[in-house]
Amino acid sequence: MYGVGAVKYKDFVVGYIEKNSFDMGGQKPESAKIEAEQVPGTPVLIILQSNGSIAPTFNVIQLNYENLHSLLGGTMHYKEEDSEKKTPIGWTAPTAAVLLTGPWEIALVSGQSSLIPNGTLLSNLGGKLTLTETAKIECTLEVAMPEDGSQPHGVFNTDSIPEEWKQYKLPPAESAAAASTNLAEE
């Protein structure tokens, strides 16, 4: 898996991602090592405490008013004569905390998509205002267990995304286990 093609929240495609800023993040699996006096230097039992997790981080550098509004909340402003609100002329920050929680898809150049049914975007306006760097929206995508208790994320070929994803769900683990059993029998 390599190369970020697009980051999507439901049907919204996030703007340009800063080169080399995307990191899968997260935590490594944790375990407790049980050691015995009779066996020096190596554990006699390893107890799994938690699976590993992902928490992607990335910087959005396409800072138009629509992206500021979509990723940070707040209010877009329009000229008085723009009654259809087609061309924003400004943006103001929100007065309350804003959470973008729900389904996310990270479409990769390599042909896969990472699907996250229940992700929460934490974002802030950051970066530098110089002639060699730009301001950016610094984002962390926290991955949580879906309300239905299904898998927190999965990776599929982009051209074969499961039907369940139309409801922003991943296929049940049982169907995946059945498919792998069928493959083993062939």
Where do the model's predicted regions map?
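Short secondary-structure capping micro-motifs at structural edges
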Residues: 40-48, 85-94
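Solvent-exposed edge beta-strands and adjacent loop segments
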Residues: 1-68, 118-136
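Intrinsic disorder/low-complexity segments
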Residues: 7, 94, 98, 108, ...
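Acidic, glycine-rich flexible loop segments
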Residues: 88-129
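Mixed-charge, glycine-accented linear interaction segment located at domain edges/termini
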Residues: 113-186
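Charged, amphipathic alpha-helical segments
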Residues: 63-93
